[in-house]
């Protein structure tokens, strides 16, 4: 098996590539669409900051052969991403609509859990462009997450204010 340091480096590489939307095309070639501001240079900087070995080459690829081009287009499941944007948006909107009916402690707990899921989805989103994903649906999801964040912050401000007003419970210390 791999040594401990090799496993740590492998995990760092996989995490950096995944967080940046790269997918494995063949044995040693990871790629992503070149649709981000800054192109390969910005991707390289981000990957290195996220833990990719600084000796790993990061470059732009053009003119893949037809078979690799076909395979490359199958690496991201755009339909699944679109569905996750839509489902996430609907779930958060529904929660926002009834959040004021929840007890404050329940609302705080749920806002934390749902918010965690939404943030994770945003962090791991590969930020693909049309036609791979529905960019409007992703934008709608992101807009709802921003609104949800404001609602959640308000809930947590009230929750923390309420907690700070409660007297501390005495604790009996036994020797």
Task: Please place each PLM-identified region on the residue numbering.
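Short, hydrophobic/proline-enriched secondary-structure or compact coil segments at domain edges
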Residues: 1-2, 119
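Mid-protein regulatory/catalytic core that forms ligand/cofactor-binding pockets
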Residues: 3-95
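C-terminal regulatory/effector modules of DNA-binding transcriptional regulators
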Residues: 66-175
């Amino acid at each position: 098996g791999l040594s401990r340091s090799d496993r740590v480096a492998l995990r760092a590489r996989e995490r950096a590539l995944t967080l940046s939307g790269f997918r494995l095309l063949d044995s040693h070639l990871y790629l992503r669409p070149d649709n981000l501001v800054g192109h390969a240079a910005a991707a390289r900087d981000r990957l290195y900051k996220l833990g990719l070995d600084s000796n790993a080459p990061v470059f732009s690829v053009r003119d893949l052969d037809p078979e690799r081009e076909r395979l490359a287009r199958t690496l991201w499941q755009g339909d699944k991403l679109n569905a996750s944007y839509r489902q996430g948006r609907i779930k958060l909107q529904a929660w926002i609509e009834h959040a004021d009916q929840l007890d404050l402690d329940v609302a705080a707990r749920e806002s934390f859990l749902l918010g965690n899921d939404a943030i994770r989805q945003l962090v791991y989103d590969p930020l693909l462009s049309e036609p791979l994903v529905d960019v409007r649906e992703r934008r709608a999801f992101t807009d709802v997450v921003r609104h949800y964040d404001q609602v959640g912050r308000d809930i947590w401000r009230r929750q923390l204010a309420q907690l700070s007003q409660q007297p501390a419970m005495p604790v009996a210390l036994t020797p």
